[in-house]
């Protein structure tokens, strides 16, 4: 089996196409370690996100039912949101989102995982917390 090449790509050119509060899009011309070139590679810059898996004392999970324009329909979701500049930590953002979206707060909190939702094109991390009680 061939070993993957983990060397970074060389950026030949980079330009911003959109710069909004919730996301930024840039198009880059890149050269791969083997010499191949990709003339238009799109990178989406987002602030970090938080997810909250919230479970009440009576062992019920809290889900939000809301319309999502990207899907064109309503969707059941766990509590989630953007880490705002005023949030000192991802945990602060998670606590704020849980309260804003459900009215619940307090309880015990544990960082469950940190991952990148789409590391091929997104620059941010998603912090997922388990909130119980």
What are these regions (language model features)?
Residues 1-16:
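Extended interaction-bearing regions that mediate binding to partners or small molecules
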Residues 6-8, 41-47, 51-96:
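Conserved Nudix-box catalytic region and its N-terminal flanking loop in Nudix hydrolases
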Residues 10, 105-112:
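A short coil-to-beta-strand element that immediately follows conserved catalytic motifs
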Residues 12-51, 57:
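Acidic, metal-coordinating catalytic segment for phosphate/diphosphate chemistry
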Residues 14-16, 113-118:
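Short, solvent-exposed loop/turn elements at beta->coil junctions and helix N-caps
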Residues 26-34, 118-133:
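Active-site-adjacent beta-strand/loop module that shapes the phosphate/pyrophosphate-binding cleft
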Residues 62-63, 77, 97-99, 110-111, ...:
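Conserved beta-strand segments that form the floor/walls of ligand-binding pockets within enzyme
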Residues 83, 115, 133:
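Hydrophobic pocket-lining residues within nucleotide cofactor-binding pockets
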